């Protein structure tokens, strides 16, 4: 068999293989889409919610109703970081004190979108000890906590070094960027906008 003929036959075989592969991939995608369109974990909690009040009092739900879960999560007591004397007084719409105007923007955006959050809730990282991420947010539907670190002084070399080290420790402790933790950054030449923050919240929650 000549090299030219071998090349043509090989190209045809490769084409046929890729067409079959593409067809199977498309079938898998359709199956996933069908599953996602029918998947509704809320139905599991709805079974309890639909019970009459008298019957609810007799039942111990296997899955805690979402309203109770969120309320319990939001009311968790904790000790955050203290504020230094002379630090600027900046308060969120929810009435809590934060350290910067950018943190206020993030907090107010979370509040406006109905995302439960804690400010500077203590988290333990192996190899670093206790840290206080700016926000721990609750993805209500997934019942999943997502951290949010806002690094607002990246133009400062000492701050930047410390921030990058902290980010490295998050990774080593299993926090996946964009899945378990959100990072936003600012410097003297760049400030984050409310539109960007809103986009992050909509895409994540």
Predicted regions and their residues:
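Short, charged/polar micro-motifs that form catalytic or ligand-binding hotspots
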Residues: 15, 93-100, 156-160, 186-187
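Nuclease-adjacent, charged terminal/linker segments that flank catalytic cores
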Residues: 1-73
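Active-site metal-binding core of divalent-cation-utilizing nuclease and nuclease-like domains
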Residues: 96-98, 111, 116-141
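Basic, glycine-rich
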Residues: 172-205
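Solvent-exposed, charged helical/coil patches
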Residues: 50-115
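Acidic, metal-coordinating catalytic cores used for nucleic-acid/nucleotide bond scission
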Residues: 124-127, 154-158, 187-191
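Short beta-strand-loop-alpha-helix junction that forms the active-site gateway
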Residues: 90, 132-166
């Amino acid at each position: 068999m000549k090299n030219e003929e071998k090349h043509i036959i090989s190209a045809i075989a490769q084409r046929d293989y890729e067409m079959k592969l593409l067809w199977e991939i498309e079938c898998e995608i359709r199956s996933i889409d069908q599953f996602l369109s029918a998947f509704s974990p809320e139905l599991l909690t709805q079974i309890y919610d639909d019970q009459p009040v008298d019957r609810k009092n007799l039942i111990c739900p296997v899955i805690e109703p979402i309203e109770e879960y969120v309320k319990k999560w939001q009311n968790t007591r904790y000790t955050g970081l203290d504020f230094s004397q002379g630090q600027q007084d900046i308060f969120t719409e929810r009435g809590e004190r934060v350290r910067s105007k950018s943190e206020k923007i993030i907090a107010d955006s979370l509040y406006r979108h109905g995302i439960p959050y804690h400010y500077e809730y203590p988290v333990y990282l192996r190899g670093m000890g206790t840290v206080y991420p700016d926000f721990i947010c609750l993805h209500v539907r997934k019942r999943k906590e997502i951290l949010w670190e806002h690094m607002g002084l990246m133009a400062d070399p000492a701050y930047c070094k410390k921030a990058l080290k902290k980010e490295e420790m998050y990774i080593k402790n299993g926090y996946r960027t964009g899945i378990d933790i959100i990072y936003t950054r600012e410097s003297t030449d760049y400030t984050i906008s409310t539109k960007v923050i809103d986009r992050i919240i909509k895409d994540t929650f």
